[in-house]
Every structure is written in structure tokens, then in C-alpha cells.
A protein has these predicted regions:
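Short hydrophobic/aromatic beta-strand micro-patches
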Residues: 95-97, 138
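Catalytic-core segments of nucleotide cyclases and related cyclic-nucleotide turnover enzymes
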Residues: 56, 102, 106-107, 124-126, ...
């Protein structure tokens, strides 16, 4: 029991219960290597919108509550298609896998954003706020790509969308 608890603590973020980024990279890399011909997967880097102002206004307790609520949306996605992790601070990542077409990845990512859009969090007795995140999407293509290339491409797409607007995702070009 103790060994299992320690293993969990070494691989999961203590605040959100999501995988730590290091574990995510390991598991996502395994998923990419195991993919069969004709399969595609997507890597999504996510950054919470307006998190700094929430943390400044409602303190660390409010910020932590916001992070946990966002993580609960990530955890609500079907695990046979989603691998989720907290990268650091207000940055998260997920892998959408087990898909035959890019359109399936888009379907699952759009579903995630729909669930997120419908989620509000009560930050004080009189104030609730929708949870919002910007995302960058990269997917496996015709070229053999490593998990590190996919993460880098998803990061580039994230920075692109953050420059333009908030609350949605864009694909790596």
C-alpha cells in the first residue's frame, strides 16, 4: 500500500491529481511508439486564461480551486482517448489518441471545450466565473514525429493563439 502511494505521489500532481509533466511525456511517448499504421494522435498544450487576475483577486485558495476545477474537466474526458497532465502553474497538456482520422481528434477536443465552456466555478459567495483556456494543437502526420517535436509544435500553436485571442485553440501550421 505504501509503495503504491509513493508511486502515485511520484507521478501525479498533488493539487490536481493529474499526471505530472514528466510522467505525461513518458506515457505519451509510449503511445506514439505503439501507434499502428493509420492512427493519428493530437497533443494539446493548454494555458488558463486570466489565471493571474483570479489568483490576485481571490488569493491562492481561489487560484487552487480554479486549477482543481479545470483539472476535473480534464479528468471527465474518456480515458480511452485522453491522457492528461499538469505541466506547471496554470499550464496543462493532454494527448488525444486512439483515433483513425484528424476529425476524431477535433471532435474530442471540441467536446472538451464544450464541457469547459459550460463549467462555472464559484470563487466567492457572490462571484462565479466560467473557466477558460487557450490551447495549441499538434498532431502526428505523415512524418515520424517524436513526442518532443509534437510538444514543441503544440507549444508554438499555443503561443500563436494567446497572441490573437483567448478561450479557444488553434492548430500548428
Amino acid at each position: 500500500m505504501e509503495k503504491r502511494r509513493m508511486q502515485y505521489e511520484n507521478t501525479h500532481d498533488p493539487l490536481t491529481g493529474l499526471y505530472q509533466y514528466k510522467q505525461f511525456k513518458r506515457l505519451a511517448g509510449e503511445n506514439v511508439r505503439k501507434m499502428s499504421a493509420g492512427e493519428v494522435c493530437g497533443i494539446v498544450m493548454l494555458d488558463l486564461d486570466s489565471f493571474k487576475s483570479i489568483n490576485d483577486t481571490f488569493g491562492h485558495n481561489g487560484g487552487d480551486k480554479y486549477l482543481r476545477e479545470f483539472a476535473s474537466v480534464m479528468k471527465s474526458m474518456p480515458s480511452e482517448y485522453f491522457l492528461t497532465a499538469r505541466r506547471s502553474g496554470d499550464e496543462f497538456c493532454m494527448m488525444i489518441f486512439g483515433c483513425k482520422k484528424k476529425e476524431e481528434i477535433i471532435y474530442w477536443l471540441d467536446l472538451f471545450y464544450k464541457v469547459l465552456e459550460d463549467r462555472k466555478i464559484l470563487l466567492s459567495e457572490t462571484y462565479s466565473q466560467k473557466i477558460s483556456a487557450s490551447g495549441g494543437l499538434a498532431w502526428t502526420g505523415d512524418n515520424e514525429e517524436s513526442i518532443y517535436e509534437l510538444l514543441s509544435h503544440a507549444d508554438e500553436a499555443l503561443y500563436e493563439v494567446k497572441r490573437e485571442s483567448k478561450g479557444h485553440y488553434t492548430e500548428y501550421q
